[in-house]
Amino acid sequence: MLVIHQRLPARSPRWDEELHLTYEARSKSRLRCFAASGEEVGLFLERGLPPLADGDCLEARDGRVVRVFARAEELLHVTCASPLELTRAAYHLGNRHVALQVGEGWLRLLDDYVLKAMLEQLGASVNAIQAPFQPEHGAYGGGHHHSHHGEAEFNYAPRLHQFGVRR
């Protein structure tokens, strides 16, 4: 079994093995799967980090570099007649905590017949497609969480808009 414990800080121009994973699989820190070669793989990554992205590289215990590829999935591709309608669609999907990929004039989400009906009711054009899915990360660190009575406020640093900071 190819055992992987570490993400590499940068994408590597060369790799020894490939993992083709769905978004759900790329979201897991613990996973048993198979490499493109058919070799069994065990992922034991640090918890609490963003999902693996297409092109990310990992280092196996034996020193091999493994590149991650986003596998094509059944998605809904959403477009609208106006930016206002697209914003409204994004608002309603966000209100339901739906993982959402945002592009120039379009949204993509995992195929779901209930959400498809809702979007069509809002006037959106919704088409089923097969494509890799790379949704937005949350705007704040620490994952998804709601404060509850008696808990301290969460003070996550923003990840989207750090004005004056260049990366």
From Swiss-Prot:
Keyword list, A-Z: Chaperone, Cytoplasm, Nickel, Nickel insertion
MF-aspect GO terms: nickel cation binding; unfolded protein binding
The keyword Cytoplasm belongs to this UniProt entry's keyword annotation: yes
InterPro entries to which the protein is assigned, alphabetical: UreE (IPR012406), UreE_C_dom (IPR007864), UreE_N (IPR004029), UreE_N_sf (IPR036118)
Gene Ontology CC terms, in alphabetical order: cytoplasm
Localization: Cytoplasm
The keyword Cytoplasm belongs to this UniProt entry's keyword annotation: yes
One Pfam family it belongs to: UreE_N
Segments traversing the membrane: none
GO term, biological process aspect, one: protein folding
Family matches, as NCBIfam families: PRK13261.1-1 (NF009751), PRK13261.1-5 (NF009753)
Function: Involved in urease metallocenter assembly. Binds nickel. Probably functions as a nickel donor during metallocenter assembly.
Family: Belongs to the UreE family.
Protein's recorded name: Urease accessory protein UreE
Native source species: Pseudomonas paraeruginosa (strain DSM 24068 / PA7) (Pseudomonas aeruginosa (strain PA7))
